[in-house]
Amino acid sequence: MKFVDEVQIRVDAGDGGNGCVSFRREKYIPNGGPDGGDGGDGGDVYLVADENLNTLIDYRFERFHAAERGENGQSANCTGRRGKDRILRVPVGTRASDEDTGELLGDLTHHEQKLLVAKGGFHGLGNTRFKSSVNRAPRQKSNGTPGEVRTLKLELLLLADVGMLGLPNAGKSTFIRAVSAARPKVADYPFTTLVPNLGVVRGENSRSFVIADIPGLIEGAAEGAGLGIRFLKHLERCRVLIHLVDICPVDGSDPAENAVTIVRELEKYSPELASKPRWLVFNKMDLILEEEAQEVMDRVKTALNHEGPVYAITAISKEGTKKVCYDILDLLDTMPRQLAEDAKDAIEKVEFKWDDYHKNQLAKAEADALAASKAFDESLDDDEWDDEDDDGVEVIYVRD
């Protein structure tokens, strides 16, 4: 199945049902009063994380998704049925944002997590809601509000503990094949890897971690060269980065310059991502003499001003790969996963269109009824008879 990690869709929440104007009419009850019911709320649109999905390809072909409209109110104070919600299932790791405003709506980081992305319209009020002591037979009602409409940008960010960086043909896919059961394509030409690959590395005592292999970066990737930097987003949730350096490039380029290029492109994309713990791993040690290898490693460390861990491996023969994996497991044990908490803290409360509408609607109805009652009382005061102010002739009728 084709890997699709970014799509744009439109979601339409359901409109609210209209209120009803109706009066109770039964035998021997000619003036029964208002009995118009409220409409039903419109259905909401939710995203739900599903661990059985690994791509957003379904939304590449179906881009319009709408919830059900609420039913109108009916007589006998019958409330309209609420519209059915629309549930959109997406892979775990999906991030949703509003394409028009850029507002981040939420991250779905665990199975069956539910995220509201479009709120249904509020129901209209029936004429029963508008009755008062001065308005015994109200003929006003309110219509339901339209449901929220959003254009969503869905991005799939892979959930991996360790991410791999490097130039094309540095040996990233060979490394992930050596340490896990993943089988990405390996060949002797650049950009063999076109989409991210995940592998699970298992250690002793049931310890394990997930490693992500993304397509290689080249100079100018931030400006769109090669495959660009669109896949770097998959490393944002990684806790550790492995910078894989080809110690003996087949094109004769300088490994130090190549390493600096990768770090420079990483910093252009995201300084926060560049600040993550980064390990330097030199690959293809079998192609160079030990003395030359040490000199190259020293030059690369100096060029990068690297003070973190450094490893030398030969991925094709798995030499040195085991120590790298076991050291990563030890490091991850000291770095508790705080993905869900960090995501929750990073996202501010999302405001939806009709959050407080029902409060405002009822408050307005009460204010209108109060104003009408006050006006009626004032009219009674103006019509009261005052004998002291009457200078006319008093007429007295006497029965014979």
From Swiss-Prot:
Q: What class of enzyme is it?
A: hydrolase
List GO BP terms, alphabetically.
Answer: ribosome biogenesis
What are the boundaries of the signal sequence? none
Query: Which GO molecular function annotations are given, in alphabetical order?
Result: GTP binding; GTPase activity; magnesium ion binding
Principal place of residence: cytoplasm
Keywords linked to the UniProt accession: Cytoplasm, GTP-binding, Hydrolase, Magnesium, Metal-binding, Nucleotide-binding
Residues where GTP binds: 166-173, 191-195, 213-216, 283-286, 314-316
User: What is a single Pfam family found in this protein's UniProt entry?
Assistant: MMR_HSR1
Obg domain location = 1-159
Reply yes or no: does the keyword Nucleotide-binding apply. yes
Q: Kindly list the positions annotated as binding Mg(2+).
A: 173, 193
What Gene Ontology cellular-component terms does the record carry? cytoplasm
Q: Where in the cell is it found?
A: Cytoplasm
Instruction: Report domain OBG-type G positions.
Output: 160-333
The family database entries (InterPro entries) matched by this protein are listed as:
G_OBG, GTP-bd, GTP-bd_Obg/CgtA, GTP1-OBG_CS, GTP1_OBG_dom, GTP1_OBG_dom_sf, OBG_GTPase, P-loop_NTPase
Query: Which cofactor is recorded for it?
Result: Mg(2+)
Role, per record: An essential GTPase which binds GTP, GDP and possibly (p)ppGpp with moderate affinity, with high nucleotide exchange rates and a fairly low GTP hydrolysis rate. Plays a role in control of the cell cycle, stress response, ribosome biogenesis and in those bacteria that undergo differentiation, in morphogenesis control.
Q: Which family does it belong to?
A: Belongs to the TRAFAC class OBG-HflX-like GTPase superfamily. OBG GTPase family.
Q: Subunit structure, per the record?
A: Monomer.
Q: What is this protein called?
A: GTPase Obg
Its source organism is Aeromonas hydrophila subsp. hydrophila (strain ATCC 7966 / DSM 30187 / BCRC 13018 / CCUG 14551 / JCM 1027 / KCTC 2358 / NCIMB 9240 / NCTC 8049)
- List the gene name: obg
